[in-house]
Amino acid sequence: MNITTDVYPYEAWSSSITSLYPERNFNDIKETEFILENLSSAEDITFVYHSLHPDYVQKTVADIANEAGKSEVEMLSHLSDESYRLGSASSAVEYVVAKGMIDSDVRLLLNWPYSNVTSDGGLECSHPRGCGTFPKVISQYRGEDGLGSLERIIYKMTNLSATNIGLKDRGVIKEGAFADIVMFDARNTKDNSTFSNSTLQSEGIDSVWVNGTRVLNNGEFTGELPGRLLLKNKE
């Protein structure tokens, strides 16, 4: 069995708060204590969206617990249970950004020969990975302390990722393949997105082609939308 994984260059993740409970045992005190001690602390779990409680946005679980006069364990349990009961698999009622990793581990995983460099997020996920992942890896994770050469980095972003998920003629530049191409200045490529402003455009990206159509020209969007749904082992 071939094993692979997707990795992005940040110490914080983003998802529904319910993802902290894989067994969905939200009222298990021991489980909640374990989460706060070993996965993410109450100070490191911040709501970036909440349809039921808009006033929770940009507050941590610790902040909300303090305002409610409850323990952090009680509050995490309550917030997660409420979110699960009132949300659905296709429509979460909230999203959090939570620190749960360290840079040395992130570098180790990025450098693993079988890992894909991916963003794992879109532009509206309130996490800088959506706009900053690839420029950040290019600018900060090259060399002996990172992933090595620029060529290896690009390979892990493109051909390796496409191969691992079964996409035909993607991630390569050759006759007959789909023309998904990025023209960038490696010396001046830099991510600008942050946790407080996650949609800032990166620097150093000149032009982008998707399926042979130019969608970014001299750093400006062309208005073209040639993207398509990609399916495993399909044209």
Predicted regions span which residues?
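Long, low-complexity intrinsically disordered regions
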Residues: R228-E235
